[in-house]
Structures are given as structure tokens and as C-alpha cells.
């Protein structure tokens, strides 16, 4: 593993102060004239790039070159519950087809479970070249040991170059366990995936609190793993004439044995599913107090929308955590989302920027939300929202209200600002 070596003879307090000012993680300590790198270091390498010369050296393990030609194909893990395929699987198949086209690789789907062979035909209709099926009675319920063993067995036999996994409860448990077995890279919650011609998968996601978009590449190991949330990508159209085939796989029974026995499955009650909402009204710091949410809920009810929030709404205790949009919440892709008093930081934008139509209301004309909004209204939401409510209800229901004038819209090729 890479590490930072300190050239002790070139260290003094002035050097420490310079490094401490550069390091965003406060990962340097200086005691008894001794400089040390603490466990807080994230290997961002900022100190190596901008720190004093002759003080720090990057020590890296010797890299063993891997023959990437031995690994072929982009595999999508099929996430399902009792044969009901999670829609994130189809979205990943669409992205896998795009990536595979760059390097001329086939697209595979890995399906494991009990009595699920017939589901392979459904996967072929989305343009998969081959579906590998492990249909075993021991795989009826998701139990981590046998499922991880099956994925490992598949990798050993097929040698895929990349494996795309949905960021579901199952995917987040399975992918890291198997990636650790191969000591290979895994990037969680990717928002963008790109492919290099040398088959390196470029995995892009916000990092360091959303301040940068990190491009992560697994250069020296295979297979490459990543997880992606539901609604980040778009599912492809079904093909009229599927061309792929199905291969039934076998595995040693000993690998399907687990110390865990499922005694009973208790289905969770269906709760809030923000990711399926077609119209959303999202509120941010611009909402001053909880009482003001009454007006917002009234507006949302008028247009048939679900009310959601950014992280401050959760921290204030105003919303259920399942209603948060963003990196630490849900990813959504509604037909319409109206952002009220939301600045549009990367943490929030990453969870909704693929929405079909985005309307933003914010008092700051330079707010980042306007960079992704299709229509923006610059102004106080406490003035704009009542006017919108009046327009929706109609003048006959608001006889005491003065005539409302809405500023003329200035239209740009793709976006509109009011």
C-alpha cells in the first residue's frame, strides 16, 4: 500500500505549519521536534503537490502488471427478490452496452437464485449477449457466504473485465466482499461511468464532501467493481429480436453451504419510495421554519407532488430520512422537480440532476442550482410560492388578491431564467 515518507533532517516547525495549512484533513502532527503523518491521512497527495520540497516522498508498492487481455466482458449482477428483478439491473445493462461498445466486449448478466431460469429470457430482451444462470435450491434466500462463493465461481470461470452492481442492500453487501477476495478496486455510488480503450473503467463520483468529482481507475487488478444507485442511468429499450443466449452454470455443493439458516422471512411494510415519485417539490435551507412547510405541502398537494428535502431538513427533524435527496439520501429522476430555496451543491445535484424537468426558485442569482435547472426563478420563495398557489387556484377563489404580474421569461436554447 502506498504511503508518505518523511525526510526527517529537512523538518522543522515552519515546515509543519506549511504542511498543516495545505492538508485538508489535518493529518500532520508535530511533537518533540518530530513530524508524523496521522491516521487521518486520505492520501489525497495535496501535500506532495503543494508542500515544501525535499520533505515528503511518496512510497508505492511495486506494481505487478496484469494481462488485461485475459479478462473480457462487462457483467451486470442481476438484483432480484424472489424473481422480481430490480429496475436498477436494466439501467446497468443499458450502461454496460455503452461501455462494451467502446472496447468491443460482450455484455453478460449474472443471475443466481432458485427457480429463476425463466427470468433469463427477460434479460435477453434488453440486449444482453449472454446470461449466466446459477439456479440452485440453496440460493433461495440471499445469504452472503453462498452468494459470494457463486460470484467468485463465476469470476474464476468467465473472467469478466468489469462487474456492475446495483447499490441496493444486496449489492452493497455482496460487491465489497468479493472485491476484497480479489484485492481489486471497488467504487461505490458512481454517478458517471466511462471506458478507456485499454479496458480500464473510469468510475466517477463526488468526493471530499462533493467539492470535487473524483475519477477512479483500477489499473492493475481485475475484475473492476462498481456500484450504482437506482435512477442514475436510463434503462434501454427492449430489443425486438434478442440475439443472446443462456448458459446454465454449476458449482460445488460445498460452496453453497452456510452457517446461516433462514428461519423465516418477514416482509417489510411498503413505506415511502421517493425514487418512484413523478413530481417532487424539494425544500432546502431557504425554508426558515417548520411551520412554513404547511404552505409547501399545500402547494405540493395542488400539483400532485411529493415533498422532499436536502440534508438540513433531516438534521432539523422536519422530514423522514427516506425523503432526503442527494449523496447521503435518495437518487431520483422524476418528470418534474421544483427546488425551493436550494443552492444546488454537488451533494444534492448528484441525486436529482437527471430529472426530466427542473424548476429552481432561489434568491441568489449565482446559486449553482441554476446551472442544472431548465427554468429558474430568482426571488424570495415566500413571495413567489403564494403567487404560484394563486395562479393554480384561479382568481375566482382569490377575490381579495391583487392582480399578479409574473416577469417575462428569458429563454435560452436549453434553459430558461425568470
Swiss-Prot record:
Activity relative to temperature: Optimum temperature is between 20 and 30 degrees Celsius.
Reactions the enzyme catalyzes: lactate + 2 reduced [2Fe-2S]-[ferredoxin] + 2 NAD(+) = 2 oxidized [2Fe-2S]-[ferredoxin] + pyruvate + 2 NADH
Cofactor annotation remark: Binds 1 FAD per subunit.
Compartments where found: Cytoplasm
Activity regulation, per record: Activity is stimulated by divalent cations. Highest stimulation is observed with Ca(2+).
Protein's job: The lactate dehydrogenase-Etf complex catalyzes the oxidation of lactate to pyruvate. It uses flavin-based electron confurcation to drive endergonic lactate oxidation with NAD(+) as oxidant at the expense of simultaneous exergonic electron flow from reduced ferredoxin to NAD(+). The electron transfer flavoprotein (Etf) mediates the electron transfer between the different donors and acceptors.
Assembly with partners or alone: Part of the stable heterotrimeric lactate dehydrogenase-Etf complex, which is formed by the lactate dehydrogenase LctD and the electron-transferring flavoprotein (Etf) alpha (LctC) and beta (LctB) subunits.
Name of this protein: Lactate dehydrogenase (NAD(+),ferredoxin) subunit LctC
Source organism per UniProt: Acetobacterium woodii (strain ATCC 29683 / DSM 1030 / JCM 2381 / KCTC 1655 / WB1)
Phylogenetic placement of the source organism: Bacteria, Bacillati, Bacillota, Clostridia, Eubacteriales
Amino acid at each position: 500500500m502506498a504511503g508518505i515518507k518523511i525526510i526527517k533532517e529537512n523538518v522543522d516547525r515552519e515546515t509543519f505549519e506549511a504542511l498543516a495549512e495545505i492538508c485538508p484533513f489535518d493529518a500532520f502532527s508535530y511533537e518533540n521536534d518530530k513530524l508524523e503523518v496521522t491516521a487521518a491521512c486520505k492520501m489525497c497527495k495535496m501535500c506532495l503537490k503543494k508542500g515544501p520540497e525535499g520533505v515528503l516522498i511518496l512510497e508505492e508498492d511495486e506494481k505487478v502488471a496484469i494481462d488485461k487481455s485475459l479478462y473480457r466482458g462487462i457483467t451486470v449482477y442481476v438484483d432480484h427478490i424472489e424473481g422480481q428483478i430490480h429496475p436498477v439491473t436494466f439501467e446497468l445493462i443499458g450502461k454496460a452496452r455503452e461501455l462494451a461498445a467502446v472496447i468491443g466486449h460482450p455484455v453478460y448478466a449474472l443471475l443466481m437464485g432458485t427457480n429463476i431460469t425463466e427470468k433469463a429470457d427477460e434479460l435477453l430482451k434488453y440486449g444482453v449477449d449472454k446470461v449466466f444462470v446459477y439456479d440452485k435450491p440453496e440460493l433461495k434466500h440471499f445469504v452472503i457466504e453462498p452468494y459470494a462463493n457463486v460470484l467468485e465461481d463465476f469470476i474464476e470461470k468467465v473472467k469478466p473485465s468489469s462487474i456492475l452492481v446495483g447499490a441496493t442492500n444486496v449489492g452493497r453487501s455482496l460487491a465489497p466482499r468479493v472485491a476484497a477476495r480479489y484485492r481489486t478496486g471497488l467504487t461505490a455510488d458512481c454517478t458517471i461511468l466511462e471506458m478507456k480503450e485499454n479496458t480500464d473503467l473510469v468510475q466517477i463520483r463526488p468526493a471530499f464532501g462533493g467539492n470535487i468529482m473524483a475519477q477512479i481507475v483500477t489499473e492493475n487488478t481485475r475484475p473492476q467493481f462498481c456500484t450504482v444507485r437506482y435512477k442514475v442511468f436510463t434503462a434501454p429499450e427492449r430489443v425486438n429480436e434478442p440475439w443472446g443466449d443462456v448458459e446454465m452454470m454449476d458449482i460445488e455443493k460445498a460452496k453453497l453451504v452456510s452457517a446461516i439458516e433462514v428461519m423465516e422471512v418477514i416482509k417489510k411494510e411498503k413505506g415511502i419510495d421517493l425514487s418512484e415519485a413523478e413530481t417532487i417539490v424539494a425544500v432546502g435551507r431557504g425554508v426558515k421554519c417548520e411551520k412554513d412547510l404547511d404552505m409547501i405541502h399545500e402547494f405540493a398537494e395542488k400539483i400532485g407532488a411529493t415533498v422532499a428535502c436536502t440534508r438540513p431538513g433531516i438534521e432539523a427533524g422536519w422530514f423522514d430520512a427516506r425523503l432526503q435527496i442527494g449523496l447521503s439520501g435518495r437518487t431520483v429522476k422524476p418528470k418534474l422537480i421544483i427546488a425551493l430555496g436550494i443552492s444546488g451543491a454537488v451533494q444534492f445535484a448528484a441525486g436529482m440532476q437527471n430529472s426530466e424537468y427542473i424548476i429552481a426558485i432561489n434568491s441568489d442569482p449565482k446559486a449553482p442550482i441554476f446551472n442544472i435547472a431548465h427554468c429558474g426563478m430568482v426571488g424570495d420563495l415566500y413571495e413567489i410560492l403564494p403567487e404560484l398557489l394563486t395562479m393554480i387556484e384561479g382568481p375566482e377563489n382569490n377575490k381579495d388578491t391583487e392582480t399578479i404580474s409574473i416577469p417575462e421569461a428569458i429563454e435560452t436554447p436549453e434553459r430558461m431564467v425568470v
